[in-house]
Amino acid sequence: MATYFVGDIQGCFDELHVLLAKVDFNPSKDELWVVGDMVARGTQSLETLRYLKGLEGSVKPVLGNHDLHLMALHGKVKRVNPKDNLGALLAAPDLNQLIDWLRLQPLAREHKAHSVLMAHAGIPPQWDVKTVLKESRKVQEALARDDYIEHLIAKMYTNSVSEWSPETKGLKRLVYTINALTRMRFLHSDGRLNFDCKLPPAKGEKEGLIPWFKQPGRAMKGHTLVFGHWAALMGEVNQPGLQALDTGCCWGQYLTLWHLESNQKITQNKLKKS
């Protein structure tokens, strides 16, 4: 059995297919952990979701911000941006089934045997493993509700919830979890989430911001953290215990696969379309 973690696919299905062929991925015995943002930007979001859903128990995804945004488009609380290339997916006859499958997925997963924790954007520095999984579970339960659109999706679009407090309750707590686990890159010096800066770490630091993984005193100990979301990193964090897997395939760069057992990375360049 082999365990693979893949970075932001974002509808780059052909590249995913070639990458998995390189490692002879066998869903009957191997596992594919997906770091979120399975859809949008690339042209094959429909094929990507159908394939991942079809892997059944062999796939272990977490949700990214684009996956949650797809739910908002499906629920008609947001308008479609043509740049997202989601037309075929939104018109698919099995869209409802694909959305229902997405709604079952968490925002964070733990591989206990190897002490690995995965979330799309990263882990707030105040949270330990227990807190991450507990707060992720609350969002997962909210997404499983019949009224999940009105209860959560329609209300999650806000930058005003940027500060963690254990006393925060209800919707605000759910929104903080979504913002932290699917949108976070930089923090302000007081620990608040910054939603505007998407620059590489060195440039953001010149503006007084702190990459979330450089915040002193992080509560997470003893786990390797796997994340995507931040294409400007191009997989380079130069810090032990971190695996950054978003390498900008949908922007013309490449898709990255991390083989857990050997600690090796395999990549596939963006394919040129004929």
Curated annotation (Swiss-Prot):
Keyword presence, Hydrolase: yes
This protein's record includes keyword Endoplasmic reticulum: no
Gene3D superfamilies in the record: 3.60.21.10
UniProt superkingdom: Bacteria
Pfam families: Metallophos (PF00149)
Record's catalysed reaction(s): P(1),P(4)-bis(5'-adenosyl) tetraphosphate + H2O = 2 ADP + 2 H(+)
Record CDD domains: MPP_ApaH (cd07422)
Family annotation (SUPFAM superfamilies): Metallo-dependent phosphatases
GO function terms (MF aspect): bis(5'-nucleosyl)-tetraphosphatase (symmetrical) activity
Enzyme Commission code: 3.6.1.41
Keywords: Hydrolase
Task of the protein: Hydrolyzes diadenosine 5',5'''-P1,P4-tetraphosphate to yield ADP.
Similarity comment: family membership: Belongs to the Ap4A hydrolase family.
Protein name, per record: Bis(5'-nucleosyl)-tetraphosphatase, symmetrical
